[in-house]
């Protein structure tokens, strides 16, 4: 059953008008359970559509317009979605599998529990997108814009975010594994309560990033800017800060556990410790002249009890 301008059409087939660019105009239709395979839908218009349990497989959907569409359990499988528009969509339990979705506009999109895997997202724009509980796996996304996006409670594995903008992104309680963030921007990014494993942030700008209560395992921040970053109650294991800029950084590594997850491979180079933390653990008050001495004393104290 299709709904066109509030008129129900019960025919098995209907004639879909064409857009001015040669595509098909499905705008504002309610489509449930449709399966479209091996079709050229480039320049088509699905704006304002309601798509439930829809499947698009092996379709060319170049420059297709899905703005303001509502999608429930939709599947894009091996489709070309380059230069398409998904602005302000509301997607629930949607999947993009083995798609090319480069230069796509997802700004202000809501994508609850989306599953994006084996997909190219180069240069795509997720500005202020809400993507809670999303699952990203084997995604190539250099130069992607995720500014102010919400990826809380999400799982990201095997992602190439090289040269990406993740500034002010909310990654609270997310899981990040095998992530390439080389030469990326993470201004004011929220990584609280986050698990990070094999995350490479070499030459990245991470000023004011928040790692409070995070767990970092085998991560690299070589030559990155971590000015005024926060790392309170943070667990570090084999984390590399070689030649990183850490002016004004605040840090309080978890102590007092039987197996503190830190070892000699960890390099903690700090310019600032909070006075209370320094005094309570070293008996020394920090001054401009003894920053290095205080840092070494705290590091030695940690290593003494480390496994």
Segments (PLM) and residue ranges:
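Tandem repeat scaffolds
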Residues: 1-303
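Short, solvent-exposed mixed-charge patches
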Residues: 305-307
